[in-house]
Amino acid sequence: MSDRPARVALYYATRDGQSRRIAEHLSRRLTEAGAPIPALDLAVAQPAASDLTAAAMVVLVAAVRYGRHLPEADRFLTVYRSLQSPPPLALASVNLTARKPGKATATGNVYLRKVIARHRLAPAVAVAFAGSLDYPRYGWRDRWIIRFIMLLTGGPTDPTTCIEYTSWRAVDDFAAAVGALVRRAGSP
C-alpha cells in the first residue's frame, strides 16, 4: 500500500445549493479518511481533461432541474467520456424523485439511468440522493413549475413548504464506498 493517498477529484453542479452541501459533506468525510479533497463548482470552472486523468477517481454530484441534469454536469461528463483511459467515476444525481422508496439507485432512478445511458458511462458507483424542496426561496416561475411537478408526482404543493429530503446517512455510505474504491486504487 502506498503511503501517499490516491488523488480524488470531486466536482459538483448545483442550482439551489443542495448539491453543493452534499459535495462539501463528501469532501469532509473523504478528507477525514486521509487527504484534503476540495469540492469544486463546475459553474465556476470546468476541469481540463488532464485534471481528470491525473485523478485516481473522479466524483460528480449533479443536480437535476426540470427533468435534466444541469448543463455544466453534461459538459463535464462529455469531457470525462472523451478520455482514452478515464479514471473510475463515482456519480451522484441529486433530484426530488429520489425521495421516494426505490428511487435512490442507478436502476430505480430515471434521471440517473438516463445520464448514464446518454453519456455511455460505467460508473464504479452510482446513487441518487433526494434534494431539498424550498418553495419560499424559489423565484415565481420556478416555484410554480416545481409545484406543478410536485402535484403530478404526489409531492407537497404548499408554497410555504421547506423540506430537506437528503439522507445524510446515505451520503456517508456513498463517501465510504468512494473511500474504499480509492484505497483499492492506491494499492500496488
Regions from the PLM with identified roles:
Residues A13-G17, L42, A63-G67:
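Short, surface-exposed acidic/glycine-rich loop or hinge patches that mediate macromolecular interfaces
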Residues D3-P5, A62-P188:
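FMN-binding flavodoxin-like domain, especially the glycine-rich phosphate-binding loop
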